[in-house]
């Protein structure tokens, strides 16, 4: 009885392995080839954030970190993390107080 279970387990494992191998051989190879992107497609893929690279000179840092992205907000006041956290906590407490029945 135990030998039958062991034999069935080996047969199942062999069947799964054969299925995996046959599916991997039949996978389309063309989709994994490198594409020749047009300049317009590269601009689309690059998006609004620009090219990002890691400089070999550690003093320069990432180009992404040195570029200031434009924002639509007219608010020029920089908000510190502690002020932002206090503001968020205040909003959450107000929402909780409004939901509580009296």
UniProtKB/Swiss-Prot annotation:
Signal peptide: 1-26
One Pfam family this sequence matches: Spexin
Keywords, sorted A to Z: Amidation, Cleavage on pair of basic residues, Cytoplasmic vesicle, Hormone, Secreted, Signal
UniProt induction comment: Up-regulated during folliculogenesis.
Expressed in which tissues: Mainly expressed in the brain and ovary. Detected bilaterally in the adult brainstem. Expressed in neurons in the dorsal habenula (dHb). In the dHb some neurons project into the interpeduncular nucleus (IPN) where expression often overlaps with galr2a and galr2b. Weakly expressed in the liver, intestine, kidney, heart and gill.
Site (Cleavage): 35-36
Biological-process GO terms, alphabetical: cholesterol homeostasis; glucose homeostasis; long-chain fatty acid import into cell; negative regulation of appetite; negative regulation of eating behavior; negative regulation of heart rate; negative regulation of renal sodium excretion; positive regulation of gastro-intestinal system smooth muscle contraction
Coiled coil: none
Propeptide stretches in the record: 27-35, 50-102
Residue numbers bearing the Glutamine amide modification: 49
GO molecular function terms listed in the Swiss-Prot or TrEMBL record: neuropeptide hormone activity; type 2 galanin receptor binding; type 3 galanin receptor binding
Tagged with keyword Transmembrane helix: no
Organism superkingdom: Eukaryota
GO cellular component terms given for this protein: dense core granule; extracellular space; nucleus; transport vesicle
Similarity remark: Belongs to the spexin family.
Main function: Plays a role in the regulation of food intake and energy metabolism. May also be involved in suppressing the anxiety response by promoting the expression of serotonin-related genes such as fev, tph2 and slc6a4a.
Protein name as it appears in the record: Spexin prohormone 1
Organism for this UniProt entry: Danio rerio (Zebrafish)
